[in-house]
Amino acid sequence: MSLSQEIVSLVKEAETVLSSATTEQELDALKNQFLGKKGKLTSVLKGLASLTVEEKKTVGKEANEAQTKLEQFVEAKRTILKESFYENQLGKESFDTLRPLPKKERGSLHPISQIQYEIEDIFTSMGFSVMDGPEVETDENNFGALNFTEDHPARDMQDTFYTVDGNLLRTHTSAIQVRALRKLKPPFRIIAPGRVFRYEEVDASHENTFYQVEGMVVGENISVAHLIYTMETLLSRVFRKEIKTRLRPGYFPFVEPGFELDINCLVCSGDGCSVCKQSGWLELLPCGLVHPNVLEAAGLDSKKWTGFAFGLGLDRLVMMRYGIHDIRYFQSGNLRFLKQF
């Protein structure tokens, strides 16, 4: 039998044997018997050494074609085995396409973020723009341009976090007022929500890291009446009811006159608790008319332009909204607390 005949016979034998494989592992083992380094086709091709050059070309081509044909046969058989395996698996297993997926843990916005976005929506509906500013500020923007004197106690290192280069962590979002006055042309209305830092003793109603929403309106003939109306509108929309408030004198260097707008404590309904320090009232909104010195420092004519400003304690507002007794929960990272919102 010539080598060509042996190759043809080997291909027929291989196809018969490979067809009998019932698994991919068995198929690979049988493939090695015929096409491996020590397989039957390799053994047959050892006879090429005794052939002439022309015969070698002919038989070599036939051998390559035989190898290609068998490899294609193996892959076709492999596809059949895979399809058969999957069909068997589907026959054994049931799959309910209507069954709900396993419940997955979902995240949510922090309660402070939720109320911040709600407040932004309220103010933008009233014609305000939302501004932002850096948390690391210059002493000038945080104090100087806001009419704080050089010896003001707020500038003391016991009240403010200073950086090594002389800057500081902003103690109030009022610093954004300065940027707004320099950047915008009056009349304008802006709010500026953000995180602030103070070197304070932490307790149920005080934190060293907390959030404020600064607000400022600059225009002509702005009065205290505009300020009170804006604040009461905000509070009634946030709490979805009329809120009892009181306005009392307060001193802040960047406003004149200055006020403290307090709300009746919603945690204890005014009876007195640790949040309101047994007073029944909670300090929520330091506010007032923008001090002429602040306007002049920004290059505005204080005889033409007036305005009001306020600094809303966002953490305390959230505490009132949800009846939370301790401000420290907000920074705790306690998921049991946060998942309630």
Swiss-Prot record:
Catalytically driven reaction(s): tRNA(Phe) + L-phenylalanine + ATP = L-phenylalanyl-tRNA(Phe) + AMP + diphosphate + H(+)
Cofactor(s) needed by this chain: Mg(2+)
Keywords, ordered alphabetically: Aminoacyl-tRNA synthetase, ATP-binding, Cytoplasm, Ligase, Magnesium, Metal-binding, Nucleotide-binding, Protein biosynthesis
Cofactor binding, per record: Binds 2 magnesium ions per tetramer.
Disulfide bonds: none
GO-annotated molecular function: ATP binding; magnesium ion binding; phenylalanine-tRNA ligase activity; tRNA binding
Superkingdom, natural source: Bacteria
Protein localization: Cytoplasm
Main location: cytoplasm
Keyword S-adenosyl-L-methionine (UniProt): no
Enzyme class, first EC level, given as a word: ligase
GO cellular component: cytoplasm
E.C. designation(s): 6.1.1.20
InterPro entries: aa-tRNA-synth_II, aa-tRNA-synth_II/BPL/LPL, Phe-tRNA-synth_IIc_asu, Phe-tRNA_ligase_II_N, Phe_tRNA_ligase_alpha1_bac, Phenylalanyl-tRNA_Synthase, tRNA-bd_arm
Residues bound to Mg(2+): 256
GO biological process, one term: phenylalanyl-tRNA aminoacylation
Keyword Aminoacyl-tRNA synthetase: yes
Gene3D superfamilies per UniProt: Bira Bifunctional Protein, Domain 2 (3.30.930.10)
Residue ranges that the Swiss-Prot or TrEMBL entry lists as coiled coil: none
Subunit structure: Tetramer of two alpha and two beta subunits.
Family label: Belongs to the class-II aminoacyl-tRNA synthetase family. Phe-tRNA synthetase alpha subunit type 1 subfamily.
Protein name in UniProt: Phenylalanine--tRNA ligase alpha subunit
Gene source species: Leptospira biflexa serovar Patoc (strain Patoc 1 / ATCC 23582 / Paris)
Gene, per the UniProt record: pheS
